[in-house]
Amino acid sequence: MIGYVLKKILGTKNDREIKKIRKWVEKINALEESLDKLSNKDIVLKAQDLYFRVNQNEHIKQAIIEGEMVEELIEAFALVREASKRTMGLRQFDVQLIGGIVLYQGKIAEMKTGEGKTLVAAAPAFFTALTDTGVHVVTVNDYLAKRDATWIGPIYRFLGLDVGVINSDNMSYIIDWQDPEKAMEAIEKDIRVWPKGMVGDAIDYSKIDVHAKTSYFTKAISVERAKAYEAHITYGTNNEFGFDYLRDNLAVSKDQIVQVKGHGYAIVDEIDSILIDEARTPLIIAGPSNLDNKVVLQANEFVQTLEIEKDFIVDEKNRTAMLTEEGIEKAEKYFNIQNLYDIRHIDLVHAINKALLAHNLYKKDVHYMVKDGEILIVDEFTGRALPGRRWSEGLHQAIEAKEGVEIQEENQTLATTAFQNYFKLYKKLAGMTGTAETEALEFKEIYSLDVVVIPTNKPNIRKDLPDAIFKTKKEKWEYIAKVIEENHAKGRPILVGTVSIEDSETLSKLLEQRGIKHNVLNAKQHEKEAWIIAQAGRKGAVTIATNMAGRGTDILLGGNPEFLAREILKQKGIDEDKATEEEWKQAYEEATKITQKEKEEVIKAGGLLVIGTERHESRRVDNQLRGRAGRQGDPGESRFILSLEDDLLRIFGGDRVKKLMEFMKIPEGEPIESSIVSKSLEGAQERVELQNFQSRKRLLEYDEVINIQRSVVYDIRRSILFQDDIKEEIKDFIKDVIHTQVFTLLTEDEPELWELEPLKTFFKEWIDLDLPEKFEAKDREELEEEIFKLVMEKYAQKEQEIGEKTMREIEKVFTLNIIDNLWREQLHTIDKLREGIYLRSYAQRDPLVEFKKEAFRLFEELMLNFKISAIQSIMNAQISKEELEQQEQNMFNLEIDTLNKSMAISEALENIAKEFQEKRPRFRTLKDRLEERKKKLEKKGESA
């Protein structure tokens, strides 16, 4: 009661947070009028001045990196809003500025669909980018990364910042003006999209100069990967940022490093999708392993002879499948072996387990699709295909065998990290989503991120109708088709969310039978995605979409006038880039009339109707689908139409609902609409969410062990990679190896009790070093020093033998190669350890504790083996006479080339010097000296 009263008086924690931020927004608004009076050039100069001020004050710079509230934020955010108005004709609402400040502080901004999240990221990204640290804006797919960077690009370019984009397949871009001359002229002539003098919320869209936008259009220009990362702000997907990090830590030269600015600040769009939904799937870079594909094919044939429940059991809740005792006996008979679980048959057991999963838990057009003889993973949260991604540990091969396509080699992990640990690399992490509050605890516990719910710009008036549940899928689909037909006849736009490609195609056929025109948006059609979504709010539009989460495009009632204007120009045969101001104006006016008229008709019909055809495991994904209706205060409706055969109901409590329907004598074809059923469904979702949270938490606990090791290994790699001379590190390695061997092999303190033979054997086998029969040392520390001198003498001999420069190169190449090979083996061993560690629980031991102990022991061995192997390889390096001669020849050629270039430069200088006769003798002398030096070298080369 007291808490309730206090909340009423003081407001919630979220209310208090918003109240504090509003004071900063008022200060930003106070600058709008004065900035509006400035010319474009003055705004550009103000941005440059702010950049220099930030970089000249280390205290302010550090405060910005950490997300502290500083006075410079007011000017930065005001400049971004002004640039947005002038180049794009968009003015950030106060709630968008609030969202931007929340992101700047390193928190999660929960903003409803249609509140303009893409634009919200611009101000915090710009302000933090002034510090010249790596600012990454993370999206869920390549299309959105490139689209968002190009769309927001005019703001950044206008204010003097570079923007990069990274896509998959190693495609990278820099965003620049589509027509640099036109853009510079527009800045010079003070051309604005948003008219001068129009300040504040009162917006007269008829005064927006649409044609002026064309002056500020941007385009993506292909560049090398590192160039995209050198930009002040880089857009890309979570997968590509993560993979580039792993690839950087497999690089064998500094030139191969692409994430040149490191990890300063990340703004993650759809943060719940990336950090929660995808957290169970680690990022893996893999190479070929030794598993024989014949075993995969044999396992695939074998599992098709088995009977479910009798020979194997499937646990859909935990997504596992395993052989029963009868199944094991069948396997031993089928493969003619005595003991299936003998160590010799480990690959066969592995292949059978994966084949069971492939046939019983992974469904075509739900979890994967077959395209051009290849298995493509379908992201269950977005419905998109993920080309280039493969399931690890033999699962992908098992599905290839199941579908009868070519089986590609199984991959061995070369580098891996979990998204949780990758994003923890950033000094400041923030994110946006329409639905984060339900996962606030997980964000706080795992990422130390607070969630702030941002108020909507206009009140939400969407109606969420109760669920309708049918006995069978057939009844459900018939009813959905009927609801669509009725609402389509009224001219109402309808969006239907399905969970699989198969479902979207089932509904599509039903609508075709009824003669209803519609668009299908799924993993097979995402190239047309933007166009389909842009039209989804038009009168009578019917859109079927697999999982709307993360689509990233607003559905405007009546349609998007800008998209329609482009269509109109296209229909008239006019290239939009070459269209005149008058042509653009006419097309836009025509499009605006059409969309405005349709919007009024759609609003009368009740706004957008959203139909969910199946409940998702996560309530968030359901809420994201609902959120497509009712944007920016528009009317709208949402409803889930389900069946007892849907996965969630079938696995979690469908029997109870079925009994209830039978008890209530619900006739066939009639739905049940009951609060008891809705609560039962929500309870099932909560249980799955909790189960998935525990799974992600457990994954993180295990990956944290590997993460500590990974950090050490990657730090060593970078230290080696970024130094030209690692001789001092090599000396330290030698000292460490000597210390370990002396203290391991000589257990007694007194020299007379030392048994030196094992020590002598080790050094002989290690680097072919013969230790003396006796040492003068009085203790083990002195003995270490004596042995170190002997090893360094041998080391000096090797350096003299192959040359100092070659020795330095060999040290780097060998150490990098060895640590990579050992780390690869470590990951393989850790994978196997993790697979079997659960067995320790049968001995009343905590598997995680046991895993930590074993992993630590393995890592200690790795570090010692690394040092031993590195020194051994360097000391045993053999450079042939031919290689040495080739090196000398290369050096000779290099020097001749350098001299030729020097002579060319001297000739250029001589030409310039003709105008300055008094300097001519000096250049002549230089040229003569260079020619003389070249002749001597050539003579030396001939005699050699």
Curated annotation (Swiss-Prot):
Molecular-function annotations in GO: ATP binding; protein-exporting ATPase activity
CDD domains: DEXDc_SecA, SF2_C_secA
Entry GO CC: cell envelope Sec protein transport complex; cytosol; plasma membrane
Listed InterPro entries: Helicase_ATP-bd, Helicase_C-like, P-loop_NTPase, SecA, SecA_CS, SecA_DEAD, SecA_motor_DEAD, SecA_preprotein_X-link_dom
EC number, as in UniProt: 7.4.2.8
Keywords, alphabetical: ATP-binding, Cell inner membrane, Cell membrane, Cytoplasm, Membrane, Nucleotide-binding, Protein transport, Translocase, Translocation, Transport
UniProt keyword Acetylation, yes or no: no
Pfam families the record matches: P-loop_SecA, SecA_DEAD, SecA_PP_bind, SecA_SW
Catalytic activity, reaction form: ATP + H2O + cellular proteinSide 1 = ADP + phosphate + cellular proteinSide 2
Domain of life (superkingdom): Bacteria
Record bears the keyword rRNA-binding: no
UniProt-annotated binding residues for ATP: 96, 114-118, 554
GO biological process: intracellular protein transmembrane transport; protein import; protein targeting; protein transport by the Sec complex
Membrane topology of the entry: Peripheral membrane protein
Cellular compartments annotated: Cell inner membrane; Cytoplasm
PROSITE patterns documented for this protein: SECA (PS01312), SECA_MOTOR_DEAD (PS51196)
Enzyme class: translocase
SMART domains: SecA_DEAD, SecA_PP_bind
Major localization class: membrane
Function: Part of the Sec protein translocase complex. Interacts with the SecYEG preprotein conducting channel. Has a central role in coupling the hydrolysis of ATP to the transfer of proteins into and across the cell membrane, serving as an ATP-driven molecular motor driving the stepwise translocation of polypeptide chains across the membrane.
Family, as annotated: Belongs to the SecA family.
Quaternary structure, from the entry: Monomer and homodimer. Part of the essential Sec protein translocation apparatus which comprises SecA, SecYEG and auxiliary proteins SecDF. Other proteins may also be involved.
Protein name as catalogued: Protein translocase subunit SecA
Organism: Hydrogenobaculum sp. (strain Y04AAS1)
